[in-house]
């Protein structure tokens, strides 16, 4: 089979745009890099979800004003600096209170529209139609790339919304088997593909090039403590007791009182690679543990009313790492031992599947 990349296509990436979330920024960069590596011309369209109701599109004059970023925040500046790794569209999606027709059609600017990755179809975020690409004209391709729902329970109203919109997509891939089963059931489609997160389709060496040692690091061995949900005192004590026993310091990267709170995605990558152990309830923190061969332990999230564990359970299952789930009341030495050989064999296979999906969805393969 002869593979040929066609004339460069201009592609819009629509995803959650959070200048404060490591995983979100890293998946955004991953999708962008994958498309660039395939010789396409991607641009990320920022989404302003802070205004109301209906959206319009308009050129950006001052990128900083969109997100009301406080320039004095070292952490925000670190995130902004990392954003230099992607090309931002001069247009943004902006919610508006009235239902006027959009004043600029993005369908006249881009050839393809890709939504994903991340939890773009989580009911908490996807109430906004742009994550279903409902602003895109029918003569443009709509592609979902490793999209996630993030929860296992959705309302009937939201299920109907998914059913209506996803039937119109030209190609759909999701990040979890549970999402695949749900969408297949809702739409009757038999072509839904389950892929790993795009961050796993980028080589570790390429992530290494983006990593940066935090200025605060003093050379001590450390445990990276990264919890998106609430962390109980009991869990903190388990981790701190083990760190004390080993002579490690604990870096609480999301604690505003921790010096490492100023870290951006580049510093996060370095910490993930160099930690002696990662303790987390985060999907992307676990992903980079696998990519960097760093020992990690997954804790169930304690403070959520909806089931948020499907993504992590699916990840551990695919890569044969179910033993990375922490159960118990004590951390022991053997949790630092991990064999990634089989996981990386599977990783190579999954990377190829992801790239093949993009090429076929966009139309870059010629017999």
Task: Kindly label every feature range from the protein language model.
Residues 1-367:
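Active-site anion-handling motifs in enzyme catalytic cores
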